[in-house]
Amino acid sequence: MILALNCYQHCLEHSSFYNANYFEAYTEKIIDKGIKLYERNAFHYLKGFALYQKGQCKEGCKQMQEAIHIFDVLGLPEQVAYYQEHYEKFVKS
C-alpha cells in the first residue's frame, strides 16, 4: 500500500498523469474499508495533489489542506510537517 502511494506521488510530482492514473486505480482497488487512517488520508492528500497538478487548483489545495488538518487532529506531527513541506514545495502561491 505504501509503495503504491509513493509511486502515485512520484508520478504526480513529475506530471506523469498516465502512470499516476494507474497507481490511483491500483490504490483504490487495494485500499479496503478497514481502519487504515494514515494510508487513507495520505491517499486523500495525493488525490488533492492530482487535482492541483491537473489545473483544478482551488479544489486540490482545499483537499490537501484537509488532509494536513486530519494528520494534525490525529496527533501525527511528523506527517503534518512532511505534507506541509510537500504542499509548500509544489503549490504556487
What positions do the PLM features span?
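Helix-turn-helix repeat elements of alpha-solenoid scaffolds
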Residues: 14-28, 63
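Acidic, Ser/Thr-rich low-complexity linear motifs
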Residues: 33-37, 73-86, 93
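"A position-specific structural signal for the A-helix of alpha-solenoid helical repeats
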Residues: 2-10, 39-46, 53, 79, ...
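C-terminal structured domain segments
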Residues: 42, 49-67
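Residue register within tetratricopeptide repeats
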Residues: 18-21, 58, 78
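Structural motif corresponding to the intra-repeat A-B loop/turn of tetratricopeptide repeats
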Residues: 14-17, 54, 74
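Amphipathic alpha-helical segments of tetratricopeptide repeats
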Residues: 24-32, 66-76
